[in-house]
Structures are given as C-alpha cells and as structure tokens.
Amino acid sequence: SRCSAGAASANDPAKRYVRFVDAQTGEPRRLAYGAALFDFEPRNVITPHAHRHMASAHLVVDGRLRVRNYDRVRDDGDAIVIRPTRDAVFEVGVVSTMSSERDNVHWFVPQRGRATTFDVVISDLDAGQPPYEIRALDPLAATPLADGTLRAPVIGFAEASARYTADV
C-alpha cells in the first residue's frame, strides 16, 4: 500500500510499506528488527563471526573502523569456508551490510581512537528456524584452499575475544 511520507504536498515522496510473506503459504510474516548504536572505545573489537537467519547494516557515524568482510561459501564440519570480499577503513557515512548471500562474516576494529556505528538488524528471516545464529570464526588460522577460499575454524566467543584484539 502507499501513503504520504509526511505533510501532504506535491514535493512529498510516496512511501510504500514492505510486507514479507511466507514463500509456501503466502501468509504475512512478522520479522523482528532493532536499531542500536555501538560505541567502540579504542580497544573494543567486534570479532570475526558468521550469521544465519538475519541481515544487518552498520553505518559509521563517528570515527573510523577497519571493516573486514567475507562471503560464507559453505559449512564444513567444525569450520566455515569463507571468501574474503573487503578489507578497508570506513569513515563517517560509509555502511557495511551483511546477509546470507553476501558479506555474511564481518570483523570491525576502530582506527585511531573511538568510533560509533548505527546498526539496523533484521532477524527471523527463515521461517521455522531460530531467530538468528552467530558463530565466532578464526580466519587468521584458516587453511587456504585451492579455489582461493579459506577454511576457517569455528571457535568460542571467549577464545575469539582473547585472540582478536584491536592490535590484530
């Protein structure tokens, strides 16, 4: 459906609501979403981790962050096969997104001081599955494969926090 995005005037854009439906039944689905600010002190890190059943966007609103992304190619026992897609420093106004199809693994480290991101997360994307799943990975200990992908071991979050510091 359509409705005005503010006071009615010729300059107002049309706003369309997005409704998600179940692919099998056509019934409307309710998704969970949230927005948050992540305030990084110079030593804070979001360690490398993979996702399921969710999508997110991370807008840098203050400072600078080194952002490393990987596509999730496949699960392989106690590891996840990943493909590097990005390793860049993001400044204010730059956004990193994540979904099942693209840049599913991310890793954020502040650069030269504090940083803040404004994040929007949507979960419950896969009907009949848990709302979300997050698994810590160890890309630095990954085994390179012949096709250019990396077999990264799944590790616990305590181990990831100890290994992946602001100096890595």
Mark where each language-model region is.
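A short glycine-rich, His/Asp/Glu-containing loop-to-beta-strand
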Residues: 10-42
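Glycine- and acidic-residue-biased ligand/ion/polar-headgroup-sensing regions
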Residues: 53-72
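Short acidic-glycine-tyrosine-enriched beta hairpin
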Residues: 30-32, 57, 72-106, 110
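Short conserved micro-motifs at the rims of enzyme active sites and ligand-binding pockets
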Residues: 109-110, 128-133
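A short hydrophobic beta-strand segment most commonly corresponding to one strand
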Residues: 57-59, 112-127
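N-terminal leader/capping segments at the start of a protein or of a new domain
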Residues: 1-6
